[in-house]
Amino acid sequence: MSSPLADEPVEPADEGAEPLTDDEYAEYLAELGPVWEVVDDHHLEATYEFDDFADALAFTNEIGELAEAEGHHPDLHLSWGEVGVEMWSHDIGGLHESDFVMAARMDRIYDGDGGD
């Protein structure tokens, strides 16, 4: 079952906003799947595993569609049986609530709970 965070809107950071503090992002991180971690207090990283390249590619394409629809784009790394994801808000140079919303939506797609 996916996190309720996946149902929240993806909203850009307000002009002049500061990245989330570690206390602030810890609450959001707890709502994500176990593949996610915060790296250097700066960005989210996850590696999703698949049985083959075709499944990894299909997942990558679904994430691409999500990113285009929301206007918030992760860095994606596709390889055989894996998709690596890095997510952060470039405008503020760190993490924003919307990064965690996107991560929760990626978990939802991976779990098959509403990727369309």
UniProtKB/Swiss-Prot annotation:
Gene3D superfamilies membership: Transcriptional coactivator/pterin dehydratase
InterPro entries, per the entry: PCD_sf, Pterin-4-alpha-carb_dehyd, Pterin_deHydtase
EC number per UniProt: 4.2.1.96
Entry's Gene Ontology molecular function annotations: 4-alpha-hydroxytetrahydrobiopterin dehydratase activity
Metal-binding keyword on record: no
Region (Disordered): 1-21
Domain of life: Archaea
Keywords assigned by UniProt, alphabetized: Lyase
Matching Pfam families: Pterin_4a
Family assignment from sequence similarity: Belongs to the pterin-4-alpha-carbinolamine dehydratase family.
The name this protein goes by in its record: Putative pterin-4-alpha-carbinolamine dehydratase
Organism: Halorubrum lacusprofundi (strain ATCC 49239 / DSM 5036 / JCM 8891 / ACAM 34)
